[in-house]
């Protein structure tokens, strides 16, 4: 079916919205246009004094870069860190860096020994009340084209503390210095892996105390030895671990005595899964991060990556629902066996089909307007009183949940107990499942078969075959 990024209402103003609460955009299900509009507005806002951005991959016709050049031409300080070693985009980045410099932007070319792979934007405003910030931290590139093909997450906030941390990161990048201290932000190589290992230790300690601890990790690849060993330790401690890993995976799931509580799946669908979400549940609270970096050693130790801990309960709810949806996927998913092979996930008899990617459109369809389902859910959860003795009476028996749903709920007890979550996923299954398996479908009308004439290619010389081979290799 046709799928297009969902657009906000015509009067939607991201810069104004972020002053009310943090915002999370999910590409390609939601359009990148609000972010571009925010940059263009900042380029002409008299209160904006500077825009700083890290650029790794850009579109060949980039509205984002055009907005930066407009800002510089309007007298604002524009700092762009362009990574010239982005594989396959070297020439494109060189061309854009020249145009940025010509427009009056300050262009930084990063470190000699570290690639700057982070996705970070900082808009600084000065008014009568003082300085204020709008900070954007993402998992994907500032590329309008790939934002319609890759699944990524973009966190935008006006939190002053995060703005100060982002400003510190840019100051360090300007003098080729690594960031050593941060609170809510993850900044590799010094404040990325160490923070995530601390989060895992917190969950392991909760498991030793008998709490229902769990970890959910979604990224592209994992090879870092320290993280793998910590995951094994968590599994042996009884922590339920669910991993969604699209690419390289150097840890095996379900190995008795080592990773028997670790479950790994890969999602390959219409869009390239590119987002990174790291969720840690200690039996009482969820601490969740999004980041630009995977768990490859090159990301954790050899690159400048940036992530952030999301604290807005609405966005924590939203990210948790996204993870749960992907753990319920039985259309695009393949699960790892203990021998390292993968087996396609097939729905059980009578179980509804759940396509995690197409289901995102239903999950986010009302996200631009108020009240958001997650904001309403969080408000109900905060105001809900303690259950009384009468309220604790057993409810009528319900139809037993499908196996995939049980597994997803077990991986994160907090999300399973949250109000409205089950109803929303029940509706989601009905919307995503376009055709019920039990309903007979009429056979499509047969089309007449046309004869196809296949021409026999002329014989090629050995030299011609070699040249054609190298053309294909390109």
Each PLM stretch: what is its role?
Residues 240-244:
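Hydrophobic alpha/beta core scaffold segments
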Residues 1-215, 224, 233, 237, ...:
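N-terminal localization/anchoring segments of enzymes in phospholipid and broader phosphate metabolism
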